[in-house]
């Protein structure tokens, strides 16, 4: 674990979902590639990595720019979603320490919130599969904001819904886009990198970079 420390007492912990709590990013990569291939198109890892932490509107914009057609972008997205939804039914797994750290934080009296670029129906489905959705006291999803991550709007709204100032809130993220959103919002940011390593400038802006969520509660409590 790398830690930079902090100055304000944390009262709320707000989690990203995809790649942070549930291992959806790997399934998503497989689904994007399979969906594109069925349409006779290629899609590379570098493009898919741009989707991580983004809202559907942003993802569609990236696809349209790459393929030059709204119809092609929509076809790839629709087929990818069909494939991914089937995979989620049998292959979705929790990230290590997800359930344990939620229980620890709630027991310690922290407000626990969710801030995900996924739509509400997707977040509810994926987290209810593991009995976690009802643990979140506030939920902010992709359809709740105009500007998705890395814009700070989602975390500013999540802090407002939690009832705390950004400097009283910790953000838990796996991706560059998510971390930048939390940092720009003025929150404490704890990163647990998933598929794509974080660039050094993002690492420098985080309070801590953790190996797993098992380390999170102690790291949050260490901020004074």
For each predicted feature, which ranges?
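Conserved phosphate-coupling serine/threonine residues in phosphotransfer and NTP-handling enzymes
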Residues: 20, 116-118
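Conserved SAM-binding loop
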Residues: 21, 94, 112, 147, ...
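Helix-loop "lid/cap" segments that line or gate small-molecule binding pockets
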Residues: 35-36, 55-69, 126, 158-159
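Metal-dependent phosphoesterase signature
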Residues: 42, 47, 64-100, 108-110
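Short beta->alpha linker loops
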Residues: 27, 51-55, 93-97, 118, ...
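Short coil/turn motifs that cap or connect alpha-helices
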Residues: 16, 42-43, 55, 165, ...
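Asp-based, Mg2+/Mn2+-dependent phosphohydrolase catalytic module
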Residues: 2-11, 103-106, 119-224
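Active-site neighborhood of HAD-like aspartate-dependent phosphohydrolases
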Residues: 5-49
